[in-house]
UniProtKB/Swiss-Prot annotation:
Domain B30.2/SPRY: from-to ranges: 546-744
Keyword Cytoplasm: yes
Protein name: Fibronectin type III and SPRY domain-containing protein 2
SMART domains in alphabetical order: FN3 (SM00060), SPRY (SM00449)
Stretches assigned to coiled coil: 205-317
Cellular location(s): Nucleus; Sarcoplasmic reticulum; Cytoplasm, Perinuclear region
Organism: Homo sapiens (Human)
Subunit relationships: Interacts with CMYA5. In cardiac muscles, identified in a complex composed of FSD2, CMYA5 and RYR2.
The encoding gene: FSD2
Listed Pfam families: fn3 (PF00041), SPRY (PF00622)
Residues of the Fibronectin type-III domain: 375-470, 471-564
A Gene Ontology cellular-component term: perinuclear region of cytoplasm
Alphabetized UniProt keyword annotations: Coiled coil, Cytoplasm, Nucleus, Repeat, Sarcoplasmic reticulum
Domain of life, source organism: Eukaryota
C-alpha cells in the first residue's frame, strides 16, 4: 500500500473557523452505539440511504451545495485532494438532500504519524455485495485490516444546523490474547489461522505469563544465590588478602630475626678470629723483639771486643802480653757462648679454619617456622560434661603455626600420699577434644601442648574438669505420700559429694499433661517433700548435679496422691515383732523361751511391743485403716517421734491411742492419753478401725469402718509432727491399709 503524506500535511493546516473539533472521549461508547446499530456499515450505503431521504425536501439544492463545500474543506484540510474516489463516494449530484439535520456530524480517525497511511475501511456486507472500494486505497478484502476513517453524526444546536468535525484519539492496537512459543512473542488468536504463525505452537497468554513469571522467579532465586556466593567469595578473598598480609609480616619478621641472628653470629666469629690472630701476632712480635735485642747485645759485645783487640795491637809488648792473656780468656768465654741466629718466629701465619656449622644451621632455620607458644586451656563450661566424658577446649596465639595438639590428663590425686595416678594422652588437630571413658563424678587434671615441625610448645596451665555424677537411686520403699505432697528419698549413687539434686515429675495417664515435666531444683540433701495435686498419679525421676552437669535420670518411681501412704518403720520395731516385706503387716509370734529384759533405747521400743509408721511430715488430713482380729489385744494411735520407748502407748502426754483387750468373752475399749481414758462402751467390736489425723483442727478420730461409726475423737496439742503407732500385747497380727480415699462419713469429724 502506498504511503500517504497528505494526512500529516493536512494536520499542519489551520482549521476553518466554521468547524468545531471535539475529542471522541467526550462521547461515551454507549452514546455512539445507538447511532450505529450495525457495526462496520459501508459509508457509501449509509450516505446513499440518507441522501434518498433528503430528496423530499424543498431546499435540497442549497443544502447539497453547503455539504459539498464542507466536504471539500475537509478534503483540503486533511490533504485528500488526490483521492478522487473518496470524493465520489461522498457526493452524488443526482440525489437531492433535505436538511443537514439528517446527517450526523462526521469525524475522521487519524493514524499514528509514524505509521503508514492505511486504506479506509468500509466493512460490511453491503460493500462486498456492491464490490465497492476506495480505488487507490485498496480493495474490500484489504480494508478488513484498516481502521474506520469517517463517521457521521448529527445534532441540533439551535434552529440552524452546524456540521462538527470531531477528531478521535488514536486507538490502541487490539490486545494480544495468545503467545507464539516458536516466535516467542504475543499475538492475536486470528493470526494463528491466517498469518505466518499458522504452523507455530501457541499457548494462552496467561499460561505464558505464569510460565515467564516462574522462570523469572527461578532466575531471581539463582541470581540471589549467586549473589550470596559471590559475596561469600568476596569476603573470603578479603580474608585471604588479610591473611597474605599477615603471613608476609610473619615471614618478614622471621627472616629479619634470622638474618640478624646470622649477622650477629658472623660478627662474633669475626671478633673471635681477629682477637686470636692478634694474640698470635703479639706472640711472634715479642719473640722476634727478644731475639732482636739479644742479637744487638751480642753485636755490641763483638764490636767492643774488636775495638779492644785493635787497641791492644798498638800497645807495647809487655802491656800487650798482659792484656792479651786477659783478653784471650774473655774472648774464649764469649766465643764459647752459642749465639742463636735462627728466627724464632716465622712471619707466616697458619691458615685459619672457619667453622660455619652453626651459621649453616641458622641459615637452614630461616625457612623453618618457630615452635609454638604454650596454649591457654579454658576453664570447664558448666553443664558440659556427662557421667563418662568431658569436653576440653583451649586457645592459641594467632601468630603460631600448629600441626597438632597433645592433650594429657589424669585423675586428681586423693589425700593418700605417694599415689601416682596414670597419665593419658590424646592427639588431636582441633582446639577441643571430647575425652570419654571417664569415671562419673570425678575430677581430672588436663594440660595441653602444641606441636609443629620446630618441636613442641611448653605445656599449658593445668585445669581441673569434672565429670557429671552417676544417677541417684530412689528408695521406693521409703516413699511417703498424701493427697497434697510426696516425700522422696534416694541414695546419692556417688562416692564423692555432689552439688545438688533435681526432682523431675510427670503426670501419668494424663493426655492433657503428656510430656510436661516439672522440676524441683537445688535440693541439697537426699530427700525432698514435693507439693502435688490430689487424686493424681506421677512418675518421678531424680538427677544429681555438680559443676560438670546433671546426671542422667534415675530409675522412675510412681506415686499416687490418693490418701496417705506410709510403711512401718523397722528401725522403731520391738524385737518381738516381725514386719512383712511390704511394710504393712506386723506379726507377734509365740515365744517359747522366757523373754529377757531389753536394754533401753531411744530408737526402738523395748517395753511396749510396738512399731511406728513413717507418715509424711505434711500438715493436713491423714487417714488410714487397721485390720485386726476381734479377739486380739492391741493398741493403735499416734505418737511424737521422741516418745519414750520404754513406756506403753497412751501412758504419757506424747501419745494417743485406742486400746482393746479381750478377756472372759468381754471386749474392753480404752482411749488413752497420759494414762487417762473416757468411759465409753462399744457394743460391736470393730474388725477394721479407721483413724483420721486432722492437723488443722488438732484432732485424732477413730471409726468403725464396717459400720461407718464414729468411736471417739481426741483434741490434741500437735505442736510437732506425729507418726502412727501400732502395738500387739498378745501374739497375733495386724495389717495397715493406707493410700485410700477418705470415706464420706469421716469428713464430718
Amino acid at each position: 500500500m502506498e504511503e500517504e503524506s497528505g494526512e500529516e500535511l493536512g494536520l499542519d493546516r489551520s482549521t476553518p473557523k466554521d468547524f468545531h473539533f471535539y475529542h471522541m472521549d467526550l462521547y461515551d461508547s454507549e452514546d455512539r452505539l445507538h447511532l450505529f446499530p450495525e457495526e462496520n456499515t459501508r459509508m457509501r450505503k449509509v450516505v446513499q440511504a440518507e441522501m434518498a431521504n433528503e430528496s423530499r425536501g424543498a431546499g435540497d439544492g442549497k443544502a447539497q451545495r453547503d455539504l459539498q463545500e464542507e466536504v471539500d474543506e475537509l478534503v483540503h484540510l486533511y490533504g485528500l485532494e488526490d483521492d478522487h474516489e473518496l470524493g465520489d463516494e461522498f457526493v452524488d449530484e443526482n440525489i437531492p438532500r433535505t436538511g443537514v439535520s439528517e446527517y450526523p456530524p462526521y469525524m475522521m480517525k487519524r493514524r499514528d504519524p509514524a505509521r503508514e497511511q492505511r486504506d479506509w475501511r468500509l466493512s460490511g456486507e453491503a460493500a462486498e455485495a456492491e464490490d465497492l472500494g476506495f480505488g487507490g486505497w485498496g480493495s474490500a478484502g484489504q480494508c478488513q485490516d484498516l481502521r474506520e476513517a469517517y463517521r457521521y453524526t448529527h445534532g441540533r444546536a439551535s434552529e440552524e444546523y452546524e456540521c462538527y468535525v470531531i477528531p478521535e484519539e488514536e486507538d490502541e492496537e487490539e490486545a494480544a490474547d495468545v503467545f507464539c512459543v516458536t516466535c516467542k512473542t504475543p499475538i492475536r488468536a486470528f493470526q494463528k489461522v491466517f498469518d505466518e504463525h499458522k504452523e507455530h505452537e501457541v499457548i494462552p497468554l496467561n499460561e505464558a505469563l505464569e510460565s515467564a513469571k516462574d522462570e523469572i522467579h527461578k532466575n531471581m532465586y539463582k541470581l540471589e544465590k549467586q549473589i550470596i556466593e559471590m559475596e561469600n567469595f568476596a569476603n573470603h578473598l578479603e580474608e585471604v588478602f588479610i591473611t597474605v598480609e599477615e603471613n608476609f609480616g610473619k615471614q618478614e619478621q622471621n627472616f629479619e630475626s634470622h638474618y640478624n641472628e646470622i649477622l650477629e653470629t658472623l660478627a662474633q666469629k669475626y671478633e673471635e678470629k681477629i682477637q686470636a690472630l692478634g694474640e698470635k701476632k703479639k706472640e711472634k712480635l715479642e719473640a722476634l723483639y727478644g731475639q732482636l735485642v739479644s742479637c744487638g747485645e751480642n753485636l755490641d759485645t763483638c764490636k767492643e771486643l774488636m775495638e779492644t783487640i785493635e787497641e791492644m795491637c798498638h800497645e807495647e809488648k809487655v802491656d800487650f802480653i798482659k792484656d792479651a792473656v786477659a783478653m784471650a780468656d774473655r774472648l774464649g768465654k764469649f766465643l764459647k757462648t752459642k749465639t742463636d741466629v735462627e728466627i724464632s718466629a716465622q712471619p707466616e701465619f697458619e691458615d685459619q679454619t672457619l667453622d660455619f656449622s652453626d651459621v649453616e644451621q641458622l641459615m637452614g632455620s630461616i625457612n623453618t617456622i618457630p615452635a609454638p607458644s604454650a596454649p591457654v586451656i579454658n576453664p570447664q563450661v558448666p553443664n558440659s560434661a556427662t557421667g563418662s566424658s568431658v569436653r576440653v577446649c583451649w586457645s592459641l596465639y594467632s601468630d603460631d603455626t600448629v600441626e597438632s595438639y597433645q592433650l594429657s590428663y589424669r585423675p586428681v590425686q586423693d589425700s593418700s600420699p605417694g599415689t601416682d595416678q596414670a597419665e593419658f594422652t590424646v592427639t588431636v588437630k582441633e582446639t577441643y577434644c571430647s575425652v570419654t571413658n571417664l569415671v562419673p563424678n570425678t575430677q581430672y587434671e588436663f594440660w595441653v601442648t602444641a606441636h609443629n615441625r620446630a618441636g613442641p610448645s611448653p605445656s599449658s596451665e593445668r585445669a581441673v574438669y569434672m565429670t557429671a555424677p552417676s544417677p541417684p537411686i530412689i528408695k521406693t520403699k521409703e516413699i511417703r505420700s498424701c493427697e497434697e505432697a510426696v516425700l522422696i528419698c534416694w541414695e546419692s549413687g556417688n562416692l564423692n559429694p555432689v552439688d545438688s539434686y533435681t526432682v523431675e515429675l510427670t503426670q501419668a495417664e494424663s493426655p492433657e499433661a503428656s510430656g510436661v515435666t516439672e522440676s524441683v531444683v537445688g535440693i541439697p540433701t537426699c530427700e525432698s517433700v514435693v507439693q502435688l495435686q490430689p487424686g493424681r498419679s506421677y512418675i518421678i525421676y531424680v538427677r544429681a548435679l555438680n559443676m560438670g552437669g546433671p546426671s542422667v535420670r534415675s530409675e522412675p518411681a510412681t506415686v499416687h496422691t490418693i490418701g496417705s501412704y506410709f510403711r512401718l518403720n523397722k528401725d522403731t520395731c520391738h524385737p518381738w515383732l516381725t514386719i512383712s516385706e511390704d511394710g504393712l503387716t506386723a506379726v507377734r509370734s509365740e515365744r517359747r523361751t522366757p523373754a529377757r529384759e531389753l536394754s533401753p533405747s531411744d530408737t526402738h521400743f523395748t517395753r511396749c511391743v510396738a512399731v511406728m509408721g513413717n507418715l509424711i511430715p505434711v500438715r493436713g488430713h491423714h487417714y488410714w485403716e487397721v485390720e485386726v482380729d476381734e479377739h486380739l489385744d492391741y493398741r493403735v494411735g499416734v505418737a511424737f517421734a521422741d516418745v519414750r520407748k520404754q513406756e506403753d502407748l497412751g501412758a504419757n502426754c506424747l501419745s494417743w491411742c485406742m486400746r482393746h483387750t479381750f478377756a472372759s468373752s468381754r471386749h474392753k475399749y480404752e482411749f488413752l492419753h497420759n494414762r487417762t481414758t473416757p468411759d465409753i462402751r462399744i457394743t460391736v467390736p470393730p474388725k477394721k478401725i479407721g483413724i483420721l489425723l486432722d492437723y488443722e483442727h488438732s484432732k485424732l478420730s477413730f471409726f468403725n469402718v464396717d459400720l461407718s461409726q464414729h468411736l471417739y475423737t481426741f483434741s490434741c496439742q500437735l505442736h510437732e509432727f506425729v507418726h502412727p503407732c501400732f502395738s500387739l500385747e498378745k501374739p497375733g497380727c495386724l495389717k495397715v491399709h493406707n493410700g485410700i480415699s477418705m470415706p464420706k462419713h469421716v469428713t464430718f469429724y
